[in-house]
Amino acid sequence: MYQDYKNVEHVKPGGLELKDRLVGVQRVTKVTKGGRAFGFSAIVVVGDENGVVGQGLGKSKEVADAISKAVEDAKKNLVRIPLHKGTLPHEQKGKYGGARVMLLPAAAGTGIIAGGAIRAVLESVGVHDVLSKNQGSSNPHNVVKATFDALLQLRSAETVAKQRGVSLEKVFKG
């Protein structure tokens, strides 16, 4: 699912204490010649609140089944996100479909300044201080995927230093 991103560390769910957050449930309709067939679509974010997070989509005729399918899908898509002292290592933008998300690191004590779907993802990752802005589409599916796009582009200072072949001091001081 995350093949387009470099340096993505996939994580197995075994041994992790994962908490799931329901982002949204939508009732969907399929119109057939015999009438309307109703179903449900659920999007869920799971994480250990310590840098590991995953998102999943589940569909079923029943709400509970859709949610449980979404949780199982999310556990299959776990990735590790680099964090720095309870916030993000640097500013990052992400996009998916019509949704655009901007994430900014914040000083300690700021809290999570985010709404709806972005908040659920950031809480599941374990970020405590961050500023965010959602632009464009507010569709929860697209916003979650745009947030993941931004998070998967994050790189720690150690990773940047290793890729550039310089010391950590050189990364920070230029």
UniProtKB/Swiss-Prot annotation:
<dbReference type="Pfam" id="PF03719">
    <property type="entry name" value="Ribosomal_S5_C"/>
</dbReference>
<dbReference type="GO" id="GO:0019843">
    <property type="term" value="F:rRNA binding"/>
</dbReference>
<dbReference type="GO" id="GO:0015935">
    <property type="term" value="C:small ribosomal subunit"/>
</dbReference>
<keyword id="KW-0687">Ribonucleoprotein</keyword>
<comment type="function">
    <text>Located at the back of the 30S subunit body where it stabilizes the conformation of the head with respect to the body.</text>
</comment>
<dbReference type="Pfam" id="PF00333">
    <property type="entry name" value="Ribosomal_S5"/>
</dbReference>
<comment type="function">
    <text>With S4 and S12 plays an important role in translational accuracy.</text>
</comment>
<comment type="similarity">
    <text>Belongs to the universal ribosomal protein uS5 family.</text>
</comment>
<keyword id="KW-0699">rRNA-binding</keyword>
<dbReference type="InterPro" id="IPR020568">
    <property type="entry name" value="Ribosomal_Su5_D2-typ_SF"/>
</dbReference>
<keyword id="KW-0694">RNA-binding</keyword>
<dbReference type="InterPro" id="IPR005712">
    <property type="entry name" value="Ribosomal_uS5_bac-type"/>
</dbReference>
<protein>
    <recommendedName>
        <fullName>Small ribosomal subunit protein uS5</fullName>
    </recommendedName>
</protein>
<dbReference type="InterPro" id="IPR013810">
    <property type="entry name" value="Ribosomal_uS5_N"/>
</dbReference>
<comment type="subunit">
    <text>Part of the 30S ribosomal subunit. Contacts proteins S4 and S8.</text>
</comment>
<dbReference type="InterPro" id="IPR005324">
    <property type="entry name" value="Ribosomal_uS5_C"/>
</dbReference>
<dbReference type="GO" id="GO:0006412">
    <property type="term" value="P:translation"/>
</dbReference>
<dbReference type="InterPro" id="IPR018192">
    <property type="entry name" value="Ribosomal_uS5_N_CS"/>
</dbReference>
<feature type="domain" description="S5 DRBM">
    <location>
        <begin position="18"/>
        <end position="81"/>
    </location>
</feature>
<dbReference type="InterPro" id="IPR014721">
    <property type="entry name" value="Ribsml_uS5_D2-typ_fold_subgr"/>
</dbReference>
<dbReference type="GO" id="GO:0003735">
    <property type="term" value="F:structural constituent of ribosome"/>
</dbReference>
<keyword id="KW-0689">Ribosomal protein</keyword>
<dbReference type="InterPro" id="IPR000851">
    <property type="entry name" value="Ribosomal_uS5"/>
</dbReference>
